[in-house]
Amino acid sequence: MLDTWAGRIVHIGDTGDGHRMKLLNNFISLGYAAIYSEALALAEKVGISPPRFDSVIRNGRMDCGFYQTFMRWTLEGDRDAHKFTIANAFKDLTYLESMAGAAGIANPLGNATKNAFAGAFAAGPADQYVPMLATHIGKVNGVDLTPTKDGKKQTT
């Protein structure tokens, strides 16, 4: 049954280790999402459009499956390309913060990532997906990163 949802299954240890590893994995991917979002907003602000930005990153060393699905919202308006909600991202990053606190380590990048998602979560709507963070980060910085699809602006 697990094969239905998992690309691969790796046994990593004791009870609870899988959940902790999931939080670490999501921290890495959501950190990328926050970086992509801020980079896209800054790029647009200095005159580099999302398609021009993508033309440099795609097929280079920073290209990966996560980047490709993330960018499908901004470039194509594909709302369903990366179906993990901002609410779930914020929740996982809050759990990561608790895990770091319990372990007694500083978590400045995790907290910065969590705060990026906290703002998007608070602004709503509740059903927006992780790639829509770019639209939110753009908006709070006076940049319109709302994608168009079939000539129409998409909504988050």
Listing of model-derived features with the role each one plays in the protein:
Residues 1-15, 66-72:
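Acidic-glycine-rich active-site phosphate/pyrophosphate-binding loop
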Residues 17-141:
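Helical "substrate-binding/catalytic lid" subdomain
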